[in-house]
Amino acid sequence: MIGTLSGIIEEVQDTSIILAVGGVGYIVHVSYRTLINCKRGDSIKLYIETYVNRDNVPQLYGFTDTEEQNCLKMLIKVSGINYRTALAILDRLTPDQLFSAIVNEDKAALKVGGVGAKLINRIFTELTPLVQKLEFNIMDKRGPSVEDSDALSALLSLGYEKTRVLNALEKVGVSHNLSDTVRFALKELSK
């Protein structure tokens, strides 16, 4: 099992890169967001997911951060979603956008090639409890307060995605009064 690969990008293809590591060139499938930042000759470290297809051919999927990698792991748990489909979803959505689409049951956001209405409904059914639990765990680390709940509502009303707001509130740390909490969270969200 491969956990990470660090090397030099030899070639950038349509949906993958060839990563030279110790004299071996690995074909690594990456999301569009990763692909647009890849340039031949650049050094890169990727977190790797390995999948062996029906023909017993191993395929490597690489991610620049563990958040996107964990989203892929979560998506492939849904019956009917394979690695390629999960990567197509991650091509279109950031992890925050994915969580938001699941929690808000935003069918249009999840509409990508190979993902029909039945599969989208299955994603909502199977992943909504998991995503809500993840959001609860973020708030639970600090112990939510009335100010946190009010700050969450205020920031959501400004149009920020719930997952981003929860992450910002987590980074703000110790609860402040409401106006300070919102101000510090807005600074965090603007980064």
Curated annotation (Swiss-Prot):
Region (Flexible linker): 146-149
The encoding gene: ruvA
Domain of life: Bacteria
Organism taxonomic ancestry: Bacteria, Pseudomonadati, Pseudomonadota, Alphaproteobacteria, Rickettsiales
Subcellular location: Cytoplasm
Chain positions covered by the region annotation Domain III: 149-191
Protein's UniProt keywords contain Signal: no
Record's comment describing the protein's domains: Has three domains with a flexible linker between the domains II and III and assumes an 'L' shape. Domain III is highly mobile and contacts RuvB.
Protein name listed in UniProt: Holliday junction branch migration complex subunit RuvA
Subunit field text: Homotetramer. Forms an RuvA(8)-RuvB(12)-Holliday junction (HJ) complex. HJ DNA is sandwiched between 2 RuvA tetramers; dsDNA enters through RuvA and exits via RuvB. An RuvB hexamer assembles on each DNA strand where it exits the tetramer. Each RuvB hexamer is contacted by two RuvA subunits (via domain III) on 2 adjacent RuvB subunits; this complex drives branch migration. In the full resolvosome a probable DNA-RuvA(4)-RuvB(12)-RuvC(2) complex forms which resolves the HJ.
Organism per entry: Anaplasma phagocytophilum (strain HZ)
Database matches in Pfam families: HHH_5, RuvA_C, RuvA_N
Gene Ontology MF term list: ATP binding; four-way junction DNA binding; four-way junction helicase activity
Gene3D superfamilies from the UniProt entry: 5' to 3' exonuclease, C-terminal subdomain, Nucleic acid-binding proteins
GO terms classed as biological process: DNA recombination; DNA repair
GO CC, alphabetical: cytoplasm; Holliday junction helicase complex; Holliday junction resolvase complex
Region described as Domain I: spans on this chain: 1-64
Annotated region (Domain II), positions in chain: 65-145
